[in-house]
């Protein structure tokens, strides 16, 4: 997942807009984030805009203003579009206390990890 990511960061959604493309273009949703923790391809405090194919939104991949997320994003395509690596696996929810909700695999209870601890573990893994 780390290897396939062009950008890895924790951030807050500050704007969501659907672009009005030319008639022959792909419909795109543009999401703007404020980076809170930068791992790869961005800087802390940076305002980052990504463009996703609007079809992801119909499949349930939606963002809300004020939402805190941790993202593993593919490098932008030739069209400038990106998406989370591994689909939903590349997008983790974060609460207001900056704890990341880990998706349960074997148990029914989601566990959390502090953003700082998760970021440190990712940085170590990226060096290996």
Task: Locate predicted features.
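Transition segments tied to proteolytic processing and entry into folded domains
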Residues: 1-128
């Amino acid at each position: 997942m780390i290897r396939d990511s062009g950008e890895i960061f924790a951030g807050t959604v500050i704007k969501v807009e659907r672009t009005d493309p030319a008639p022959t273009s792909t419909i795109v949703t543009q999401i703007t984030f404020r980076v809170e923790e930068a791992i790869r391809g961005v800087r802390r405090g940076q305002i980052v805009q990504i463009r996703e194919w609007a079809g992801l939104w119909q499949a349930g991949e939606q963002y809300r203003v004020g939402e805190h997320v941790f993202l593993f994003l593919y490098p932008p395509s030739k069209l400038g579009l990106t998406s989370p690596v591994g689909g939903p696996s590349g997008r983790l929810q974060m609460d207001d206390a900056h704890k990341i909700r880990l998706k349960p695999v074997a148990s029914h209870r989601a566990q959390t990890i502090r953003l700082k601890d998760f970021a440190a573990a990712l940085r170590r893994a990226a060096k290996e």
